[in-house]
């Protein structure tokens, strides 16, 4: 079942993100960050267990980011990540967002949705907000991708 996240989901969302972050797949998120951006998150439940999470973060009037896509190890390759991304893209369209971007180590996954690889320089709002806090800044090794809606 796909739904918007609730306050009671925050610790499980953080555990999912931390599991992926510990493998170098994404940046970790603090409990505070997840609470601050809880309304951004969609979650997926299987048999009443939270097995996936993904956020759509609004950056500017015409730009949003899909971030913190995490699926529990045992539930990968079952389409959960794709469902979460589609939910975020539907919301972006509903909100009138014209461009959605992602920073990823898995460009082939996002290319399935029509995302194109771009230079990070086209993402100024992103670079100056989250990237400055990143341990990899300024040597980011993630791939920037954009989808025009």
What is each model feature region?
Residues 43, 49-58, 62-70:
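Conserved beta-strand in the GNAT
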Residues 98, 104-130:
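Conserved active-site alpha-helix within GNAT-family acetyltransferase domains
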